[in-house]
Amino acid sequence: MSFPTTPEHLEELAAAFQAKSTGEVFAGCVGATDGLHIRTAAPSIHDVLNVLRYFSGSKGCYGLNVQAIADAKFRFVCMSCCSPGSTNDWTAFMSSKMSDAVATLPHGYYILGDAAYPLSDQLLTPYPGKGLDAEYDSFNFHLSQLRVKVEQSFGILVARWGILWRPLRVGFDERPKLIRALFHLHNYCIDEGSTPIGRGEEKEKTRKRRPHTTNDILPDDFRVAKPTGARRSGEVEMRRGIMLSLQRVGQKRPRRNIERNTPR
């Protein structure tokens, strides 16, 4: 697991995402980022000064906010598991070494995030608001089609490792080590072409405990709660350039997607 720094690695990751981008307009994307809530047993006052920082009110349990960046092939290129469960994605990302690594990406390369992340030329996020003009809505839709790779990567990770289906009960200092090991093993399994055991192949007891994933999308129980209300505004050159490219080729959100998301 290594963050891309060499021209060869950057070009390899960017080519894989561009091939999956409609009209190949998302040139330069080398990853997609998001947060994963991993449940843990409550830490003790001997482990941390503020135990409640590890409690997520939205999840109703203790845990860790794990930040990660995935490539187009469901491999993780970077991860951080040092933030308490109550931490939002913005804070967890900015307090990790990942944010420094992303900030050093060469001009023209970037990762994708959702509205919880800070917009920059190296980290593109959706345009804020509802009822957007077609060109902004198109950008948001096509960004989400690529950003979903990190959610699918999390989904594969969680479905594969049964130890994540219940709160981690290893020692407090051992939890980050265990989580990192699972991420490395995930990449190894992807490289080896190993497929997680299907639900139909499992014993009934195990099948009932396994988190149910559809198209490898992460179940809600593992998602970090997202902020509600107004989103941050602003614009950066890279995002505007892609939005204009989509507009120039007449690429809009597919009608079937609009109809599926229209309230009836």
Set out the residue ranges of the language-model regions:
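Short, well-ordered secondary-structure "scaffold" segments embedded in the functional core
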Residues: 1-264
